[in-house]
Amino acid sequence: LGDFRLNHPLDQSYRLIFQHILYNMVEKEITTANVGTVVLEEKDYQLAEITVKGERPQVKLEGGKLTYDVPQLMKDKTATNAFEIIKDLPGLIERNDNLELVGASRLNIILNGQLTTMSADQLIQLLKTMPASRVEKAEVMYNAPAKYNVKGALLNVVLSKNESEIPSWQGETGVDYTQYRHAGGDAHVNLLYTNKGFSIDFLLNGNKRRDVMGEDMLARHTLNSGMTEISQHNRALVHVNRGTVRLGMDYTFANEDKLSLAYYLKGDKVLSDRDAFTSYLDLSKPENKSESTSLVRDDGHSAIHNIRLQYDGHAGISAGADFTRYHSPSVLDYQDTNTNGSRTDMINNTRQDVSRWSVFLNKTHSFASGWGLNYGVHGGYASSKNYSEYLYEQGAGYEMDEEALEDNTQKEYIADIFAEVSKNFGERFSATVGLKGEYFKSDYASSRENMNLWNEGALFPTVSLSYTFSPRHILQFDISSDKTYPGYWQVSPQVTPLNSYSEVAGNPLLKPYRTYEGQMVYIFRQKYMLVAFCEYTPDYFAQLLYQSDTELKTVFRFENMDYSLEAGLAVIIPFNVGRFWNSRITLRGWRMQEKNDNFHGISYNREAYLGLAHMSNTFNLCDKPNLKMTIDGQYVTPGAIQGIYDLGSMYEISAGLKWTFLNDRASLTLKGDDIFASSIPRTIKINQGNQWSRMRKLNDERCLKLSFVWKFGGYKEREHDSIDTSRFGK
């Protein structure tokens, strides 16, 4: 209803009373200068047996963006962090900690509209450390404006701002207990200081957990006109310790220009102990049977440092610079003993060091005629140094295998220039057309060879059209394209053994892939959505398993395909049953096709028809005490494919109970995720040409979580940034 300020010294506690003819009265006891956001509940009016109820729109179209009022949508949810809030937005689907937007190939995420070099994965990890109370609004774009320096779909998470004319300290702290197969925990502290145009925020988060991983495999490997049956049992225990620190400062000048400086540090230590039991049976000579036992310990850690400076001017100018440093050494101790008398004792030392710079300059013009112009430039440089050595026990100590030594450097240069024009044609029709030109060069150098991986330019046109039949009926159409490059380790020719039969290998011949996609979105009554989508990706790559034709090994490696093609429809249906039950149903059906004419001696052209059903439910059990319950479910039909993989069905059921108390300053939440341990395919099958195997995955995603959160000083969080590490690591 508005922003209010009382110019009165706060020398004692006060009681504020909020009253409006259309809303229920709210009383609030305050002891701090910044009250934060106060949400009023709408009244129901009964007039002569006629009940008139007000309903807020689920979604609005603002400048080509689908805008969601997050506090209103999520006020009764049991979410305890920002990620849990975001993943429940209409049209978003969460799978194994990854967010998908219905009808989009990939979803980029930014905070408060600021340019960022962080990947979606890294930003998701950061959102998990933020309180849910921080999220104020979410903006979804199927076709991101060029000024954001991302291509394709974009989710802009707008976080609440705490501006105060007098010095103010606020904060939140919380602890989580998590029970997977083993117990774990998480703790966080967020502090914010504001004074007129200056603010400083601090985030500290730490977590510790142990994960159980494993696979059971049955394979029939054809080699030299013979067939060997391999039966394998893998189990691993992974210890993870992780910490995050973020310090940010913002200053707003009198003319509304804003200067932002942020430092981000994330460090983790991962210790994995894996054992595997493998049996080999020659089907033509059953007497030729052998068994091996593999013990693998992988001890590694990583650290990411990021510093970012950005200036946003009131005249439409944005400029900034970003630097990221990544360091990740690891030691792998591999021992394998076979009943045929062979034994392998090997140590694999690896190290990756990445330095990346990025600068940008954007300018926006808004003309009185209704036209808008946005243009800018972006430049970047990255250097990745990858090192891998193998030492084998030969009876007199460990000796290095000089031929297997890999020491390479990959340097990248990138330059972008873009222009974008927008126009509102009356009150109904609006259009945005943009073009980005990109030059990308990557050089690879090692002790064996020097080569140019990629040296190419590309154009990325974008079109966004929207037509408003009425404020409650909107049609939107988007066309965009994107390009995805492999990770640094993925093109490095190193090999990492998993056990006596399986290994992970790099692919120096891996190529980037281009994506072309389009969406048509119809919004009915500002809450129901119908989405039609199509996506074509030539040279698409994914990690696939194949059985070697030169040795008895199965290899996990990223491989290019000829193309991937998907097209389908989705519908989103929200509904309420009084104040007690709030629900949303998402239904999606699509056709997928993947083709490859040369995959290790075989070819495939595969298609599948799939369906997805997702339902989220919130129940308002009672107001005093304030108890809310959520039950969410998702089901994916069997038949999904990835290359030569056949994936089984997946479903997930989660439930939670949240108690809010101490005048909404504290909450206690009990939640069960993936209750039936069924969120990943139970079985992955391969039966293409001479490739045959069955793999059953062990699921350790089932979790019981108990969370306590306490806010002090009227805390409402500020924005945090992170870094793109999607191409770092193995």
Predicted regions and their residues:
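Short, surface-exposed beta-strand/beta-hairpin micro-motifs centered on an aromatic residue
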Residues: 2-8, 125
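A short, solvent-exposed loop/turn motif at the edges and junctions
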Residues: 13-29
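Membrane-proximal, glycine/serine-rich, low-complexity loop/turn segments characteristic
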Residues: 44, 49, 55-279, 294-327, ...
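Outer-membrane beta-barrel translocator domains and adjoining extracellular loop/strand segments
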Residues: 152, 213-227, 272-289, 329-340, ...
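Surface-exposed extracellular loop regions of Gram-negative outer-membrane beta-barrel proteins
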Residues: 152-153, 159-175, 243-247, 268, ...
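Outer membrane beta-barrel strand-and-loop segments of large Gram-negative receptors
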Residues: 356-358, 511, 517, 530-589, ...
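C-terminal beta-barrel architecture of Gram-negative outer-membrane proteins
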Residues: 613-661, 666, 673-685, 689-692
